[in-house]
Amino acid sequence: AYNNLPILPPHAELETVQILKKTVSANKALAELHGWTYMQANPLLLLQTVSLQEAKSSSEIENVVTTNDDLYKAFSAPDSKIISPSTKEVLHYKDALWYGFNEIKQRPLGINIFIELFHKVKQRSDGIRSLPGTVLKNSYDETVYTPPDNKDDILRLLSNLENYINVNEGNIDPLIRLAVIHYQFECIHPFPDGNGRVGRIINVLYLIQEKLLDVPILYLSSYIIEHKSDYYKALQDVTEYADWTNWILYILDAVEVTAKKTLSMICLLYTSP
């Protein structure tokens, strides 16, 4: 187990020419999406639609699969007795996302919010694990990583992560920091279950906290599904070789591609008769 996971910030050059060039294009795509949603008087319906799709995609990464049809039926009749367990789990994710969005208006993103998101996603009342965590496996079912298994280490690492999220020493671009935060949370893997989903909610909440978005509209799950083996390879390369470059470029590309895709989808929704 990786009990000696290095604390943040990473001892590596995060602002290479290649990374900075990609940061510019990712920020531009994100700013265009931000500008468009900012101009909408009432984007709530749009946000509900997009967040339902994210809940579905993010859960799919964890092999919790439902159909759009089941999802929208359950969303419009949440008290129905015939909702499948998978669909319920997807709806819990959506609720957790909106809960987090409302919470970060009042307090900074940190350990307490992480635990509350876990409670919402998994509908259970325990918290940071005391037992060995689930290993991370790639698309071929090979173990790529075994997270820390000592609760004191987990709490120490989470406390360090919380500090990194809220104190930007060195004035590093928030999108580069997003990649670092996502890597670190995935590696700490603090909960008995639901870590991937909680981590992906943290991504969008961080962008909102950094004022790069006003509302939870950008989700990386569909990109991760499409490029899943690259995701695990880049993650593993940081752990094994301290190669941050490919991981950061992967996350920056995910932000850029997803921002453009989301904006196209919104424009289509708002301009179609």
Predicted regions and their residues:
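FIC/Doc superfamily catalytic core
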Residues: 1-273
